[in-house]
Design a protein with these regions (language model features):
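Acidic/histidine-rich catalytic neighborhood of metal-dependent amide-processing enzymes
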Residues: 3-5, 10, 14-31, 35-110, ...
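Active-site-adjacent substrate-binding region
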Residues: 102-186, 191-196
């Protein structure tokens, strides 16, 4: 084939709407999260804020949290909380074992209470669940492997609870999402910024 170690190879990206509210494409992780944040930021009522809110986009999460760690080191203050917005790899696919990371698509975004690099304090979990419930937003609570950019803030003692959307077939050319989960995620991000 003429392909050698070190050669760059890419798959073409194509967003495909499926039946109902499902869509498939390559690289929803983390383009979908960026979209949810941008929509929340555009909808944010700046006059409603009585505290500082910072939205951060960083790079190289998959190869050592390079961007997030640099931001955490440079902020110069201690945020009350960090909510990394990232994929939640769901075990709700037909062939997956459903005893871990079971978060069905179309049933709302996911608050990550536990992963391989963090344990969210109970008060943060309860506060976020209360916020969502008070606004009738569906929110799933999940535990999974892996980690997020929020881990870059751990060394500073800053509590973090990643939030995201359930996704099947992560890091493949056919990642699968339910667009309703992204809409609710954007609403949740806006609520966190304005009210919590």
């Amino acid at each position: 084939l003429g392909v050698r170690i070190g050669d760059t190879v890419t798959n073409p990206k194509e967003f495909v709407r499926l039946a109902g509210t499902r869509a498939t494409a390559r690289s929803f992780d983390d383009r979908a999260g960026s979209t949810a944040q941008l929509v929340a930021l555009q909808s944010l009522d700046l006059n409603a804020l009585d505290h500082e809110v910072i939205f951060i986009w960083s790079t190289e999460e998959e190869v050592g949290l390079v961007g997030a760690t640099a931001v955490a080191d440079e902020l110069g203050f201690t945020p009350a909380r960090v909510h990394a917005v990232d994929t939640f790899v769901s075990s709700a696919a037909p062939v997956d074992r459903q005893n871990f990371a079971f978060t069905p698509l179309g049933q709302g975004p996911v608050a990550r209470g536990l992963d391989s690099s963090s344990v969210t304090p109970r008060a943060i979990i309860d506060g976020l669940l209360e916020l969502a419930d008070g606004h009738n937003l569906p929110l799933q609570l999940g535990a999974t492997n892996g980690g997020t950019d929020g881990t870059g803030f751990r060394d500073w003692g800053i509590p973090h609870m990643p939030i995201g959307w359930p996704l099947r077939y992560s890091h493949s050319p056919i990642e699968l999402i339910d667009l309703r989960d992204l809409v609710v995620l954007s609403d949740l991000i806006q609520l966190i910024a304005e009210e919590w």
